[in-house]
A protein has these predicted regions:
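Long, hydrophobic N-terminal alpha-helical segment
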Residues: 1-65
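Helix-turn-helix/homeodomain-like alpha-helical modules used for DNA recognition
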Residues: 63-143
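Short, charged, solvent-exposed linker or helix-capping segments at domain edges/interfaces
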Residues: 145-147
Length: 147
């Protein structure tokens, strides 16, 4: 048994029960974005959160322990994503990455945007030309240290 097995079980039960990530997150007491990332194997849950997820998804004690193991983050099955939605993000970074970097450096100086001290919010906005996906990424700016 490993973390991937638990992720597969969570997805299987979610589909079978017709659950929504937002409802799961509400029970865990965290954002839907963070809980979804965790359930998909990208975050570490604490004991209390793992217990709640165990109740929701029918996970036994050993399976709940796997939710508390630090995962190998950013582990996609291929170097270049093949899923169309994930590929669009890859494409956006390829097209706009240098622009984002330039504008962040112009505003903040030489450094990076943290993906650790970070939050994300995904919302739907109605639009007569087709609903829009709004994604807000908020990461702490970390300047490079001079030494």
């Amino acid at each position: 048994m490993n973390r991937n097995d638990i992720t597969e079980k969570i997805i299987t039960v979610k589909v079978a029960k017709g659950l929504k990530w937002e409802d799961v997150a509400r029970q865990v007491g965290m954002s839907k974005e963070w809980v979804t990332a965790g359930c998909l194997g990208q975050m570490t849950f604490d004991d209390k959160q793992a217990t709640v997820l165990g109740e929701i998804f029918g996970l036994d004690a050993e399976e709940q322990k796997w939710l508390q193991v630090v995962p190998y983050k950013g582990s996609l099955p291929t170097q270049v994503p093949t899923d169309p939605l994930i590929y669009r993000w890859y494409e956006m970074v390829n097209v706009y990455g240098t622009t984002i970097k330039e504008l962040i450096h112009e505003e903040f100086g030489d450094g990076i945007m943290s993906a650790i001290d970070f939050s994300m919010d995904i919302q739907r906005t109605a639009d007569p030309k087709g609903d829009r996906v709004n994604v807000l990424l908020s990461g702490k700016f970390l300047p490079y240290k001079q030494y």
